[in-house]
Amino acid sequence: MKPRVAVVNSKSFGRFTDAVSRLESRCIVDQIEVPKNVSEKELAEKLVGYHFIVASVTPRYDEEFFKSNADVVMIVRHGIGLDNIDLKAAEKHGVKVVAVPGYREREAVAEHAVALMLSALRRVVEANDSVRKGGWHERAKFVSRNLSSLTVGVVGFGNIGSRVAEILRKGFGSRVIAYDPYVREEKMRALGVVPVGSIVELMAESDIVTLHASLSPETYRIINREALMSARRGIILVNTARGELLDQDALAEALDKGVVSAVALDVVEKEPIGLDYPLLKYGNVVITPHIAAYTREALTAMDETIVEAIFNYLDKKPIEGIVVDPRESRNLVL
């Protein structure tokens, strides 16, 4: 009997590669859609009989799920974020958890962050809309600044944040400062980046702030009202990390007061959004639908990680990207 793989709520896994057919050479593979807020018990019942889960950003996999489903032996995230998986509960119940190593989507996300940065700074979307409405003569209102002349603050200096900083320093010659209490200052300075000691300090010194921190209790709404109201007036905010890093209500207030001059987001707190999403009323807000990692190169690398992880599990080989490896792991029972 073959092991079973559930691809849950992922529309991109295998879309541009032969990942599904490769898995099917050794496993039974099913695409499963569930509501993003499905209950843990209902989710556990839906996935009875599946041994491997290819997980997207939804739904959540918490204690109740692991307690109620004894079949799953490994969850593999089709991405690098793990905030929808209770890692402690997974370990407690003997379930391995794997995430795509950050380097697999580093270039894609970093490039998108810079693209959003330039779009917000140069008001590309607004200018395009103006032309489409016959406003070619309104060019003067889109006079902007050179990115090379500005200070960019990077929040989170890990795999992606450090690459964004490198692009800005070497490609544009921007002054870059960074805040990350978990990274040695020497690593920042080696890239020509100036470390700062707090979010408030970073906000006060930056013309543009780009978010690249992982989501945790410490970083939840790290850009709050205090941080926003301490910002240099006219600051631009870019977020390609997690929507929960930003306090949406405080951001709207900062936009209304002119403290924030433009925003470019690839993520929001509750995805997906509809036409009633509050920030859509602002012409100086650009939002893309969580596509920073959506390049063929990144998706191919992510698919490869997932196939390799499942095959290596079956072959009892080391698994790249493993973040939870319980001492007493569940056994695969066919």
Predicted regions span which residues?
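Short, conserved active-site loop motifs that form the nucleotide-linked donor/cofactor pocket
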Residues: 27, 95, 193-194, 284-286
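Phosphate-coordination loops involved in phosphoryl transfer and adenosine-cofactor binding
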Residues: 2, 72, 148-151, 225, ...
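Gly/Ala-rich phosphate-binding loop of Rossmann-like dinucleotide-binding domains
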Residues: 165, 169, 256
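Rossmann-like adenosine-cofactor binding region
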Residues: 48, 61-65, 174, 181-278, ...
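Phosphate/diphosphate ligand-binding glycine-rich loop within oxidoreductases
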Residues: 50-128, 237
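N-terminal glycine-/charge-rich "phosphate-binding" loop or analogous flexible N-terminal tail
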Residues: 1-52, 186, 314, 330-334
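Glycine-rich NAD(P)-binding loop of Rossmann-like domains
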Residues: 104, 128-163
